[in-house]
A protein has these predicted regions:
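Non-catalytic helical/linker scaffolds that mediate oligomerization, partner binding
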Residues: 1-480
Length: 480
């Protein structure tokens, strides 16, 4: 594995063709994101089937992340686009209307989430078109909210709206989201990204839907609201992973605060052994150009050095002019950055449980032995995640008896979820099967040294309590 930091790429019109998806995998994609803010179930199923077929042909494990759109707040339909000027009046009507100009320097619109208008107060701000236009609330009555525009900008139909100063209380999971979740369950996606999470309750609601359908899927909370930043500790505890979604976050909080918030969230996720994705506008210029800016390359590099498990491409791969090139640039940036990576963080974290002590010891011992790889025999994937937390400068190869578990590790830093073995209650048989499969697939050489972690009794989550050093003699024994 050339790189340890993983790449998530969004599938869209620019990347949906089989030959492009194939090249993106070859260039370094580990996880594909299906963005349910756009497209039909049939569209996403077609892309999902293509990804899985191509990954199988390439003998590569690729994870699937379903990004649930959530209650995105948008402008209603406009009769025609507005060219708003500083000082113009813009009224937000409580009823559904067709947005239009009603007088000189005076416009009216409606929004799709009307209950939010009841939560606004005088002097609060509304940001339109994903933050490009700012409006200040100056008057509120039973019919409308009156605002004054504070900067010039164009406004179109169905554009995003943010309320950074307003405490908003709306359901994070809409009926559309519930239908999309059922699609994800049916099609066995590996990760769910939940939009506009504000607290742990929002994660618990999704987990309850999964439980009602007798399934488990790793839930990633998208941090893009100010409330989420305030409640980050409880969100990390409740979720399986975190996505730092810097687009909306940079509207909800002053954008110059985003870098420090990103670093803090990554550190907290690392502390909790929860995978974290850094997302949005990482190589944004590649949506329209073949080359990235130096600042964008530095942005990717800094996210890697911060300790992110994965970096994500959005528009760059969904609608960009050359998605495979975007993946290649990101991959090369990661590889170069990891030459100066602060590996071996054995003393950076507190032990959360006894498994942490075992995994820290195994990562440390493997480094001291100059082992060629760590093999993690795992039922749930947690032991491999915990080893990765310490960032050893050697490959972590996950061995499991569940495709679902191995797929869930496709997003975790430094973990190669490569070896699928049969489930066994006999530890010796499990070790033999693991060593044989690893040698046959070319991940283990009989003349090298490895470290292996496992749990006894076998097949039980949370029982990692065993470390084995595998040298030539031990490998030969298990190959008998």
């Amino acid at each position: 594995m050339l790189k340890k930091t993983k790449i998530v790429a969004t599938v869209g019109p620019a990347s949906e063709k089989e030959e492009i998806l194939r090249q993106m995998i070859i260039n370094g994609v580990n996880v594909f994101r299906l963005n349910f803010s756009h497209g039909t179930h049939e569209y996403h199923k077609k892309n999902l089937d293509t990804i899985r077929r191509v990954a199988k042909e390439l003998h590569t494990r690729i994870g699937i992340l379903q990004d649930i759109s959530g209650p995105k707040i948008r402008t209603g339909e406009l009769k025609e686009p507005f060219e708003l000027k500083k000082g113009d009046r813009l009224d937000f009507y409580r009823e559904t209307i067709l947005g239009e100009k009603i007088a000189q320097n005076h416009y009216k619109i409606s929004i799709n989430q009307k209950s939010i208008l009841d939560m606004l107060k005088i002097d609060e701000y509304i940001y339109l078109y994903d933050g490009s236009i700012r409006a200040k609330v100056v008057s509120i009555d039973d019919q409308k909210i009156e605002t004054i525009i504070e900067n010039d900008g164009f406004l179109n139909s169905n554009k995003g709206i943010n309320f950074p100063n307003t405490k908003i209380n709306i359901d994070v999971i809409t009926q559309k989201d519930k239908n999309d979740l059922l699609w994800g369950i049916k099609n066995e996606v590996d990760f769910l990204a939940i939009s506009f999470v504000q607290n742990a309750h929002d994660i618990d609601e999704v987990r309850e839907i999964l439980a009602q359908n007798n399934t488990k899927i790793s839930i990633f909370a998208k941090i893009e609201k100010f409330d989420a930043v305030e409640n980050i500790d409880e969100i990390i505890k409740s979720s399986d992973g975190i996505m730092v979604a810097r687009g909306d976050l940079g509207i909800e909080v002053p954008y110059y605060k985003v870098p420090n918030i990103q670093k803090e969230i990554i550190q907290k996720a690392n502390n909790a052994s929860k995978p974290v994705i850094t997302a949005t506008q990482m190589l944004f210029s590649l949506a329209k150009s073949k080359t990235a800016t130096r600042a964008e390359i530095s942005d990717v590099a800094n996210a890697v050095l911060d300790g992110t498990d994965a970096v994500m491409l959005s528009e760059e791969s969904a609608v960009g002019i050359d998605p495979a090139n975007a993946v290649d640039i990101m991959c090369q940036t990661i590889i170069e950055t990891e030459k100066r990576y602060p590996y071996n963080k054995f003393n950076d974290f507190n032990d959360l449980d006894n498994t942490d002590k075992i995994m820290r010891s195994s990562a440390h011992l493997a480094t001291d032995l100059n082992a060629d790889a760590i093999f993690s025999l795992t039922s749930s994937g947690k032991s491999a995640i915990k080893i990765a937390r310490y960032r050893p400068n050697i490959e972590i190869i996950a061995v499991g008896h569940s495709e679902k578990t191995l797929n869930s590790l496709s997003i975790v830093w430094g973990v190669n979820p490569a070896i699928l073995v049969n489930k066994s209650n006999e530890l010796t048989e499990l070790l033999k099967d693991s060593v044989r499969s690893s040698v046959e697939k070319g991940f283990m050489d009989e003349d090298k040294c490895y470290l292996l972690t496992a749990g006894f009794p076998t097949g039980v989550e949370g029982t990692s309590n065993l470390i084995r050093i595998l040298n030539k003699e031990q490998i030969a024994y298990y190959l008998q």
